[in-house]
């Protein structure tokens, strides 16, 4: 197998509050991999956690890690016979399942136990992400999109795919009443996806007035402070008001509240990553026969997300708080970590 090596400038996390611009070699197989010059990236919660705490959930930083799993770019080189073309603009799916295990063969690649997810410290060695000048990926990871589509829109492909998968986990939403608890970037994209999927009423909650305002911009009919009991109490009357609750905050109180607010035979979709254990009113879930399902990453929804963004079916731009150059990555991470100021912060590479 022939290997090529190029110089690559990357945003590398070394430890707590230690992210640096590093010039390092990128070795790739030109006969097997697609070389993509990165144009833009979006900072996600996990990037912030690696920066602030050197860990994201159970994934602990043991070695330097190139951050980023939300990124798009322009193809620089392709293997002979590829369906892709040099100069084509692509969104890159950061998922790299094994495609051999029973789960993958059943079409459940998002829960593959050997998943190599770009920008993740789950495994050692870690899997580098896309906050760099170039990445080498498989052809299957590249989803082309139209030249006229805006980069700042298309870089939402990965988080919107998460939201679309959550909506798919809920089943048919046509005519349904929906609650979304937590109106951060993912919660707001769930709001937009639920509305697109036919929900007749979408209500959002968040403690932050800024987040509630964004929820309204992204399609919520109402946005409520969850501490305002005069607004939330009616949702528990008559056994529960909402057909589907999407829990996107990970906050224990919000997680528990979904059992009260969901009507009998309704569905709770857990999207937010909360603590390892939480208290849940199981009695309510039992007697109301509420179905609780998890939602983790995505499968085919990544391609769907690209098409929705490309066609303007969903406009994510209200969520963009700021843009920074690659060499301003520390400032970008600082702002992204300040939830009083930022929803989605983007990095511009080219």
Question: Each PLM stretch: what is its role?
Answer:
Residues 2-10, 256-257, 299-350:
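C-terminal hydrophobic helical "lid"/dimerization subdomain
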Residues 180-183, 195-257:
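Adenosine-nucleotide cofactor-binding segment
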């Amino acid at each position: 197998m022939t290997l090529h090596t190029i110089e690559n400038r990357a945003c590398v996390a070394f430890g707590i509050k230690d992210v640096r611009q590093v010039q390092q070699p990128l070795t790739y197989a030109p006969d097997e991999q697609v070389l993509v010059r990165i144009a833009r990236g979006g900072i996600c919660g996990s990037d912030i956690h690696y920066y602030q705490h050197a860990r994201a959930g159970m994934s602990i930083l043991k070695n330097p890690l190139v951050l980023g799993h939300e990124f798009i770019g322009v193809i620089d080189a392709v293997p002979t016979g590829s369906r892709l073309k040099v100069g084509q603009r692509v969104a890159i799916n950061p998922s790299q399942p094994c495609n051999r295990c029973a789960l993958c063969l059943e079409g459940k690649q998002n829960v593959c136990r050997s998943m190599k997810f770009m920008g993740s410290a789950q495994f050692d060695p870690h899997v580098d992400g896309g906050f760099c000048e170039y990445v080498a990926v498989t052809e299957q990871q590249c989803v082309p999109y139209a030249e006229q589509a805006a980069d700042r829109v298309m870089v939402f492909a990965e988080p919107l795919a998460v939201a679309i998968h959550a909506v798919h986990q809920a089943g048919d939403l046509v005519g349904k009443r929906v609650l979304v608890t937590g109106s951060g970037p993912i919660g707001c994209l769930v709001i937009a996806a639920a509305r697109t999927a036919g929900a007749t009423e979408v209500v959002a909650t968040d403690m932050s007035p800024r987040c509630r305002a964004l929820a309204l911009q992204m399609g919520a009919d109402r946005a409520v402070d969850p501490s305002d009991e005069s607004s939330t109490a009616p949702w528990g009357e008559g056994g529960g008001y909402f057909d589907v609750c999407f829990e996107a905050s990970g906050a224990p109180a919000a997680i528990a509240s979904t059992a009260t607010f969901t009507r009998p035979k309704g569905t709770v979709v857990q999207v937010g990553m909360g603590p390892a254990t939480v208290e849940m009113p199981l009695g309510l879930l039992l007697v109301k026969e509420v179905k609780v399902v998890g939602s983790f990453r995505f499968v085919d929804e990544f391609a769907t997300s690209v098409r929705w963004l490309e066609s303007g079916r969903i406009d994510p731009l209200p969520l963009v708080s700021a843009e920074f150059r690659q060499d301003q990555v520390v400032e970008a991470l600082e702002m992204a970590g300040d939830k009083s100021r930022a929803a989605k912060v983007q990095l511009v590479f080219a």
